[in-house]
Amino acid sequence: NMAVNEAFIDSATVRENVVSLARNIGYVPRSRRAAIAKINFTVDVSSLAARYVTLNAGIVALGNIQNGSYTFSIPEKITVSPGSNGIASFENIEIFEGNYLTKEFIVNTGQLDAKYILPNTNIDTTTIRVSVTDGDTGTVEVYNAYENIFQVNSESRLFLVQEVNDEKYQILFGDGVLGKKPPNGSTIKVSYIVTNGTDGNGASNFNFAGNLAYPRRSGDTIVDTPVTQNVSLLTVPQPSENGDNIEPVDNVKYLAPRVYASQYRAVTANDYTSLVPSVYPNIDSVTAYGGEELDPPQFGKVFITVKPKTGELLSDTAKSAIKAGLKQYTVAGIQQEFVDLKFLYVEYDSTVSYNPGFITNKEDLSSR
């Protein structure tokens, strides 16, 4: 009976089986998500005559939360040109809670069933970056995450991510017809951030620990030279938030068939109810309805109400993030508007009837 139960998404209980069944209908369960904070800082390079300053990928800051200190990183480098005063300003830099790691694979086309599986769990798949270095020419090509079939041809440098056993992730590439196939002997470099999920939420005090560099001429070559001084204190316009754990099995079983029914197109209100939780993790419940249901009707609009897991109302930043995530699914002519929740608090008085023969002291009622 158990074997039969595990063959259907409604009755399966083992995560690997549920994920595999969801994959058959095109649903990729959400990975663990890193808490994201925004920081500002400046670097004075007036004495270095630097044309630009680069904040390299990897650790950027250490954030303090009540339950300890956490590492915050960025998945790719950020380059800023200094102003006329020689000061480079890094503003609203998004930093992700977690450790930045890399893994390399050598392509061997003679191996029929080659698999590129990342060895770590707790990866935030949105931070995965992939590049391929040609073994003959040394040319480096950046591969981007697959979004939809319309962008794919034989030269499309794209990769797919799918969850495999033990909550690890496999990187998939094209076959030379649908997506470019990495050439034999090339080196695949995958970088990603391993995160603590919800534990990283709430950091608002950061100490800089990043790696800054600027280009300096040395003979006939340009070398990256570290910048170790004149870095300002960090300011934090947004504390870390929206960290979440991997999508639970029950959620996968609920959302997978509904997202499949929407065909990844946000057209009806039910489509939005299914797609919003898949693009934004910090959601307890969501309701959507079309403007045609209002009096007077507001055609061409869909209204979305979200109850977040933390707090009572969505922030403007969260609303913008959801809209950005939905953009790839929406159709032209439909506007999304968020409606804040209204809470109804009820206070009540009660009258209790009891038999004095069983309870001699009415004060004892409070323990019954």
Residue ranges of model-derived segments:
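Carbohydrate-recognition loop of C-type lectin domains
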Residues: Q263-R368
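Short, well-structured beta-strand/strand-turn elements
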Residues: G63-S73, D136-V142, S274-L294
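A generic structural motif
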Residues: G68, E76, I87, Y169-F173, ...
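Acidic, glycine-rich low-complexity/disordered segments
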Residues: V80-G138, Q170, K180-A266, V331-R368
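Solvent-exposed coil/turn segments that connect beta secondary-structure elements
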Residues: D44, K77, I193, K307-K309, ...
